[in-house]
Amino acid sequence: VIGKVGKEHIPIPFNFSSIETMFSSKEANIIKSHLLEEHGNEVKVPILNLMKSKNRFVKELADYVYTNIFFNYTKKMWDLEPQELDPAVLSRVPIQIGYDDRYFHDKYQSMPKYGYTKMFQKILDHPNIEVKLRTHFKDISNPEEFKKIIYTGPIDEYFDYRHGELPYRSIRFEFFTENKEYTQKVATINYPGFEYKHTRVTEFKHMTFQ
């Protein structure tokens, strides 16, 4: 994943490669040395933690990243400013102290050979699975027959809105096809700036190796 920040394309999560792209070599080396001194190497630090740093270089970097990436992207995604959200939301994409630009660090990572649609079709085709369409959760007449029921609907609706309605925000997906091998160099490009109406563009070929 990379982000379009101004005229530059920088790796996200924000890491040492991002710093080297956005700052001069001298500035980047100073910033990296202070980050390493304060936090160590190959660790992930939430942006809000960096913003509380007493180190001038670390604090200035954190403010820069917050203003140019986190604030705009959060406002576009949720229509709320970061301080209006639970801190855990911003902690999902921490700053990486080092050059690792991966979102996930699991030892084993994979994708279904024939895609998720085919995988779920085969799962639901099992003789022990009954699929009921257009059926409301509360209209199931025999829930006691099942050891476990997994509810995936709105959680406030499940509790009959006894605590009110939650402020959900929807996402609009737009799909388009271009007659070329690839349209971008990586799978996903994020667009945090307000000059773009969209938040990201994903080219799935990079992930499925079509």
Predicted stretch roles:
Residues V1-H9, K44-L61, R162, P167, ...:
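Short, charge-rich amphipathic segments
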Residues K4-K7, N41, Y99, Y116, ...:
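Intrinsically disordered, low-complexity regions
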Residues I10-I12, V45, V93, Y191:
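Intrinsic-disorder/low-complexity coil detector
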Residues S18-K148, T152, E157-F159:
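Active-site/ligand-binding neighborhood in enzyme catalytic cores
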